[in-house]
């Protein structure tokens, strides 16, 4: 079952941008030891936009092999071309993932009907559980609650990652969505309140550096121990902020390198974290006892 803390895993790279398979395997094992409930490979945080198709599928297969059935693996397979999204989703299914995460088409700004037809066609083409992903800050299009509700009744579409931070949407969607439709937060700051409102967990950037704390926070929120969950979230507040001082995953990759978990490699057009932010990220990690 998809629930709890689902890390939006980075894709480790060497300084020259080549993929670091050893670091990837170690990161996966660390997350399993720390209590992460599911792993999302090659999403936004995994730099899917700068991986070619061969690399994209290779990373998915590497994560699936390393996890070896211990927790669910979700693959980012969204694209702004419907046919490409179908191709990636089928390849991810063939690679053994448990579900796919499909970001709303970006840059070409489809209408709500276009969003519906895009996801409907992918769902009809590949028989695997699929999560919608609404992140208008990156895609320039907002998948409205009524569109999400329509899609909830389409076979193979099982949930949505909602990254607007708008808690009111949880109730709006759950009221009319198909029974059992999963609402997953895509915003670390508001995840506790999102879960308390009826969400099943979060896909987290902060979990890259604080897997145990984020897993505990999600579990407490799911148990209704909201104040205890909020206390953990307060401890992580500066980390949440630090992870977005520059475009994700720039800060989180620097943080993981600082923690000694991987090199600080990243691909253009993204660049390593500006030196002016190093101290702020380091202080946030230390304040949360992550360093």
Swiss-Prot record:
SUPFAM superfamilies assigned to the protein according to its UniProt record, in alphabetical order = Aldolase (SSF51569)
Entry binding sites for pyruvate: 45, 203
Q: Name one GO molecular function term.
A: 4-hydroxy-tetrahydrodipicolinate synthase activity
Which Enzyme Commission number(s) are listed? 4.3.3.7
Looking up InterPro entries in the UniProt record yields:
Aldolase_TIM (IPR013785), DapA (IPR005263), DapA-like (IPR002220), Schiff_base-form_aldolases_AS (IPR020625), Schiff_base-form_aldolases_CS (IPR020624)
Q: Which UniProt keywords apply?
A: Amino-acid biosynthesis, Cytoplasm, Diaminopimelate biosynthesis, Lyase, Lysine biosynthesis, Schiff base
Site Part of a proton relay during catalysis — annotated at 44, 107
* The protein's enzyme class: lyase
GO CC term (a single one): cytosol
How the protein assembles, per its UniProt entry? Homotetramer; dimer of dimers.
Q: Which PANTHER family match?
A: 4-HYDROXY-2-OXOGLUTARATE ALDOLASE, MITOCHONDRIAL, DIHYDRODIPICOLINATE SYNTHASE
Family of this protein: Belongs to the DapA family.
Q: What name does this protein carry?
A: 4-hydroxy-tetrahydrodipicolinate synthase
């Amino acid at each position: 079952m998809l629930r709890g803390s689902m890390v939006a895993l980075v894709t480790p790279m060497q300084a020259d941008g080549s993929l670091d398979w050893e670091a990837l395997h170690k990161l996966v094992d660390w997350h399993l030891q720390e209590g992460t409930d599911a792993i999302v490979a090659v999403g936004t945080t995994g730099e899917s936009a700068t991986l070619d198709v061969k690399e994209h599928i290779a990373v998915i297969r590497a994560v699936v092999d390393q996890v070896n059935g211990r927790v669910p693996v979700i693959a980012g397979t969204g694209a702004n071309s419907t046919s490409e999204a179908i191709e990636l989703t089928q390849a991810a299914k063939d690679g053994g993932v448990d579900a796919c995460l499909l970001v709303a088409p970006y840059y070409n700004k489809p209408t709500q009907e276009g969003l519906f037809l895009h996801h409907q066609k992918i769902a009809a083409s590949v028989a695997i559980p699929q999560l919608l992903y609404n992140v208008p800050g990156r895609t320039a299009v907002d998948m409205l609650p009524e569109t999400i509700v329509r899609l909830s009744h389409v076979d193979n579409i099982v949930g949505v990652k909602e990254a607007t931070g708008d808690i009111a949407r949880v109730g709006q969607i759950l009221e009319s969505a198909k029974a059992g439709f999963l609402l997953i937060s895509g915003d670390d700051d508001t995840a506790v309140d999102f879960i308390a409102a009826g969400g099943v967990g979060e896909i987290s950037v902060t979990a890259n550096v604080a897997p145990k704390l984020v897993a505990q926070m999600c579990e407490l929120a799911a148990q209704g121990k909201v104040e205890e969950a909020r206390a953990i979230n307060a401890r992580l507040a500066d980390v949440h902020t630090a992870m977005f001082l520059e475009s994700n995953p720039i800060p989180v990759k620097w943080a993981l390198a600082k923690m000694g978990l991987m090199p600080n490699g990243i691909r253009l057009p993204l660049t390593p974290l500006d030196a002016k932010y190093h101290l702020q990220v380091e202080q946030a990690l230390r304040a949360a006892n992550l360093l």
